[in-house]
């Protein structure tokens, strides 16, 4: 009898954890199927925003305005077209030189380092970041600065061949993660994501899930925020050994990615592997095909390589 009650409680608690979206995982997969069929609609909305920004940039009357619009264009192209995002980071650098503004130069350099890191140019990204004098950085750039170091060292650790090198890169990742926690506002999305990441690294999966769910339940989150939160939730469930939780939150993350029209993402590819393992071959192929097409359009070479290896 006690065993039956325990199983019942476990099922109820699981339902509460997945209740925020009020959809079953199967319903989420069907939603993804529909979004993939019509994903050009979301791409058209993004292209319209980009066209408007380019028009504003062309009509700008000062370098300050041009710098701002180039920044917005960098943000729009981030995870959408990496070559274009790099072009606008370079334009920001040119304008910063012209205005002789050191903080603008540092911001542009970090934009370029971000793109380099995303495309696997880790050495070049670290060299560029190394040219920035941390002592002269304004407060508003510290979070971005530490975030880039943490992300790049984390990626280098993921792809390191030897255990010794992997351990060193992860040690550096830990250092910059702690630095990030010191500068991010405690109620910010960035702080919650980094803190949850730290909990996951230290096998405190339930605590990570708790804080992520608390933030996820906030109203008016944009798709990008939802994508990051739910992907991190999926990692917490994966490491707990809860495949259903992992699948559920990967599905939510994939939906948010597709709706925000980003092309450089991970969730849909990982979800494809899970549904493949369950024997849903056609759906897995469709998800991988979509992921490969988007990665190719984005010029996300690392993602293209990862997906090609699955094929």
Question: Each PLM stretch: what is its role?
Answer:
Residues 5, 15-311:
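A "functional boundary" signal
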Residues 9-10:
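Classical Sec-dependent N-terminal signal peptides that target proteins to the secretory pathway
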């Amino acid at each position: 009898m006690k065993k039956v009650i325990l199983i019942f409680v476990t099922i109820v608690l699981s339902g509460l954890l997945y209740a925020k979206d009020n959809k079953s995982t199967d319903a989420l997969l069907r939603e993804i199927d529909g979004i993939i069929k019509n994903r050009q609609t979301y791409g058209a909305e993004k292209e319209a925003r980009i066209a408007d920004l380019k028009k504003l940039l062309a009509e700008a009357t000062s370098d300050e305005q041009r710098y701002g619009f180039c920044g917005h264009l960098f943000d729009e192209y981030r995870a959408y077209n990496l070559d274009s995002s790099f072009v606008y980071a370079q334009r920001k650098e040119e304008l910063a030189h012209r205005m002789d503004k050191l903080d603008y130069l540092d911001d542009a350099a970090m934009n370029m380092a971000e793109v380099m890191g995303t495309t696997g140019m880790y050495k070049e990204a670290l060299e560029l970041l190394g040219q920035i004098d941390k002592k002269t950085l304004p407060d508003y750039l510290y979070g971005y600065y530490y975030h880039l170091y943490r992300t790049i060292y984390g990626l280098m650790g993921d792809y390191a061949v030897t255990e010794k090198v992997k351990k060193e890169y992860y040690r550096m990742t830990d250092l910059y993660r702690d630095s990030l926690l010191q500068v991010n506002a405690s109620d910010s999305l960035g702080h919650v994501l980094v803190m949850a990441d730290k909990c996951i690294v230290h096998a405190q999966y339930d605590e990570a899930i708790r804080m992520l769910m608390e933030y996820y339940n906030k109203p008016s989150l944009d798709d990008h925020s939802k994508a990051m939160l739910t992907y991190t939730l999926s990692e917490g469930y994966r490491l707990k050994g809860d495949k259903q939780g992992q699948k559920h939150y990967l599905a939510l993350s994939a939906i948010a990615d597709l709706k925000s029209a980003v092309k450089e993402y991970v969730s849909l590819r990982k979800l494809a592997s899970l549904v493949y393992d369950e024997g849903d071959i056609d759906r897995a192929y469709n998800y991988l095909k979509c992921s490969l097409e988007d990665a190719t359009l984005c010029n996300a070479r690392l993602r293209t390589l990862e997906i090609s290896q699955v094929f």
